Every structure is written in structure tokens, then in C-alpha cells.
A protein has these predicted regions:
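Active-site and NAD+-binding cores of ADP-ribose-processing enzymes
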Residues: 2-65, 97-230
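Extended catalytic/binding region for NAD+/ADP-ribose chemistry, centered on the ART fold
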Residues: 65-98
Length: 230
């Protein structure tokens, strides 16, 4: 029987609004090359070196911690193509999308540093931009724009990509927090020593004047007022 004109549609909700699905048995990924000489930015705790991988034992990020086929943790390292991206993906990650100025405790910047590393040789990474995601069979909203409750599911995709593409050395996507830049996550078991070369000393986000000025500039652009540590 034909539906009545104007009747509400009974079609299922769009796949774009569904939770992150499990990765299929066979993935169709697109690999791209990160060129030699590319400089990447990182924000991390000052107790770690600029090119030091997270051992992957604990944490709760979109693509880490993850394990290989033998249940062993895969070391990971996150980076971005700009300092803005690195700051937005770390210390400003949870700033709410509310109008007007928001306050941010300066104490949250303590112990955080900005580092840069240069890629010493080309690296092959899985491209998670919108076009290759269509071939992969998942939407950006399901994989990259989810909230934290979906992180266990998004990590399954990182594990599956690592398992099925033995030449993949990491993942690359348009940053959710700063869509003018690219974010990266590298697989530590596939990045030889010396490939990520630190460029100069790491800079404290609080104690280094130039680094703090850059943080203040970004804070103003996202409507954040940095207040003294409580």
C-alpha cells in the first residue's frame, strides 16, 4: 500500500548519526605519504622527550591505547601540522562550544611543553580524510567526530588498520579541533629510531614568553580567558 502523502517517513536514521560500527573483516584504506622534511608540532608533558612515544599501557584517546595481534601494546605518538592544532588537540581539547568568553585555569598549562619534530624520511600513513573514508566504509562523524564514549570503538579501527596494513606507519586526518590542520598518530613499532628528529629545545607553555603568547593568541580566538591557577 502506498504511503499517505505527508505521512512521516519510516526510513531508518542516517548512518551518519549512528554509533561507531565495528570494522569489517576486510578494510579498503588509502595510504598517503608524509614527505621528508615535514615539520610536526606536539604539546606534551615536560617529562617526555619531543619524539618519545607513549608506551600504550594506559590512557583514553581516540586511537590509543591499542594492541597488536599478540595483545602487546603499540606505542603511539600524536602530532599536528601547526602549533594551533597541537594546542587545540591537547590542553584546549575540552573547551566547550559555548558563546562568549570561557575561563581556563592557567594551572592546566603547568608542565606542558611545545615541541617540533622533523620527518627524516617519507612515512606512509592511512588517510582518514572525507574522500578516502567513503572507500573505507565509515563516516567522519562515526570515526573522528565522536564523543569520548565511542573511543573504545574508534580504537578498534586503529587496531584493524594496523593489523591489515603492515606498511602503514600511522594515521592522518583533518583535526576535529582545528580543521585548518592535519593531525597524526604514529605507530611506534613501525617508526625507526631517528626518523622523528627534534627541532631545538621544547618550550614551556607557561615559562617561555613566545610559546605563552601563542597560547594567549589562540585562547582569544576561541573565546577563552586564561585565569590564574587556583
Amino acid at each position: 500500500m502506498a504511503s499517505k502523502r505527508g505521512a512521516p517517513s519510516s526510513a531508518p536514521a542516517s548512518v551518519a548519526t549512528s554509533p561507531t560500527p565495528a570494522p569489517p573483516g576486510t578494510l579498503h584504506a588509502t595510504l598517503t605519504e608524509l614527505p621528508k622534511g615535514q615539520v610536526l608540532h606536539r604539546v606534551h608533558q615536560d617529562k617526555y622527550r619531543a619524539n618519545q612515544f607513549n608506551p600504550g599501557v594506559r590512557g583514553n584517546a581516540r586511537f590509543s591505547p591499542i594492541q597488536d595481534d599478540h595483545g602487546q601494546p603499540i606505542p603511539t605518538l600524536y602530532a599536528g601540522t601547526t602549533m594551533d592544532c597541537a594546542v587545540m588537540e591537547t590542553v584546549f581539547h575540552d573547551v566547550p562550544h559555548t558563546a562568549g568568553f570561557k575561563t581556563f585555569d592557567k594551572g592546566k598549562l603547568a608542565g606542558q611543553v611545545h615541541s617540533t619534530v622533523a620527518v627524516a624520511r617519507p612515512l606512509r600513513v592511512v588517510d582518514l580524510a572525507s574522500v578516502p573514508l567513503r572507500k573505507l566504509g565509515i563516516t567522519r562523524k562515526q570515526l573522528l567526530d565522536t564523543e569520548k564514549d565511542q573511543y573504545p570503538a574508534t580504537r578498534k579501527w586503529a587496531e584493524a588498520l594496523h593489523r591489515q596494513y603492515s606498511d602503514a606507519q600511522g594515521l592522518s586526518w583533518v583535526s576535529r579541533q582545528d580543521d585548518s590542520a592535519r593531525a597524526f598518530m604514529f605507530f611506534g613499532d613501525r617508526i625507526p629510531d631517528g626518523v622523528l628528529k627534534p627541532q631545538g629545545a621544547s618550550r614551556s607553555l607557561v615559562e617561555d614568553g613566545n610559546a605563552y603568547d601563542a597560547v594567549l593568541d589562540l585562547a582569544e580566538r576561541i573565546g577563552v580567558l586564561i585565569v590564574p591557577a587556583r
